[in-house]
Amino acid sequence: MKEKKPRLFGTSGIRGRFGEKVTLELTAEHRKALATHLGGDGEVVVGYDTRTSSQLLENALIAGIVECGCDVTRLGMVPTPLVGYAASRLGAAAGVMITASHNPAPYNGIKLWNPDGMAYRPSQERVIESIIHSRDFKRKAWDELGSITTVDMRDDYVRAVLETVEIKKPLKVVIDSGCGAASHLSPLIFRKAGCRVITLNSQPDGFFPGRDPEPVPENLSELMETVRSTGADLGIAHDGDADRMVAIDDQGRFASFDKLLALMAREIGGKIITTVDASLCVDECLGDRGEVIRTRVGDVHVANTIAEEGARFGGEPSGTWLHPDFCMCPDGILSALRVAELVSARGPLSELLEEVPSYPNIRDKVPCPDEKKDIIMERVAAELSDQFSETSDINTIDGVRISLDDGSWVLVRPSGTEPYIRITLEGKTEEKARYIHERTRGYLENVIG
């Protein structure tokens, strides 16, 4: 029986603890595989975040790329959106970002980008994995090695971003970059856009001394309090690589991811791409101004569907947004500026958020051994709808999403990183949400055993 090779790529590139899953050896092999895949020809742009292991990994990565014949353009310590932008702007064969995004300091990772700034698709990642497992690297002779150059793309990126936004009136904005890769760039762009900026955690530091890189409410108490105490119009927080952003309204409250996505969808209109776990409020807020199309969870799937549908905007309910008029790479800095643009034109964010309907939601997980996930999900697809008498639609593009006649819904998906089956649901009322949760969890506990 042929041995099954382990998957190296997860839902967002290769990611894990440095020295354990993410090692110098794996990084070098990964880069050799990329350069081999590219035929030992072309330019690869490389950036990294503020983590203590990032420059070390960059050195291993560059060595592997050059050894197999590709040229390297070093961007330095930059946020992920700048890597995607540089890949498309410079006509590179690929882009590489060394980052673990929102994960804690001991973690690091590698994510790949296409020439149009879109993340590598799963099919492309499997090709890289196959080359790594086979060790069929196409090394070059001493006189065919790639070259290494360093380019500063920050000014170019700043100019390009500012051309796409217009802050109609000056705003006071508090920016918490979390000591990540946007620590200098995000405040700089906001100032150039005409905002008065107060910064928190704006010193690049891979130990993340100010807060955890994950921009969730429990990590943003200082930002929320600063917005309140300074009378700011808006608060912005980024994760470690700034492919995401979150917003704090003018009352110092965390802005719901789904509601913020809904507001931006309404503002832009047309075809809007989001994921199967996004709230019904996105559909209701957009109304007849456009169409919501749902796809699999993950920014690469959102990007692919944007390209296929010719959509004007797409995003996940995690603060990961894509703006195809600029670049197909998720961009937390541009997203934050467009929220500021919305506030400057439409009024206080707290009032705008009140215009978006709220529905009770529940997120839960049920223990399930990894080896049982496939068979359990087959049963879920065939049987879960029987738990409800008013099913209107079943979507199996990513897990199983069941919509009920009143718009309530439940999504069941296997975790890609933990031994759990995850439940996400939304009910039109608290009672309906509890009912859906009880029926779904009870069913899963019964079939998992």
From Swiss-Prot:
GO biological process entries: carbohydrate metabolic process
Residue numbers bearing the Phosphoserine modification: S101
Cofactor annotation remark: Binds 1 Mg(2+) ion per subunit.
Record function comment: Catalyzes the conversion of glucosamine-6-phosphate to glucosamine-1-phosphate.
Lineage start: Archaea, Methanobacteriati, Methanobacteriota, Methanomada group, Methanobacteria
Enzyme Commission designation: 5.4.2.10
Species this protein is from: Methanothermobacter thermautotrophicus (strain ATCC 29096 / DSM 1053 / JCM 10044 / NBRC 100330 / Delta H)
Gene designation per UniProt: glmM
Protein name: Probable phosphoglucosamine mutase
Post-translational modification: Activated by phosphorylation.
Molecular function via GO: magnesium ion binding; phosphoglucosamine mutase activity
Active site: S101
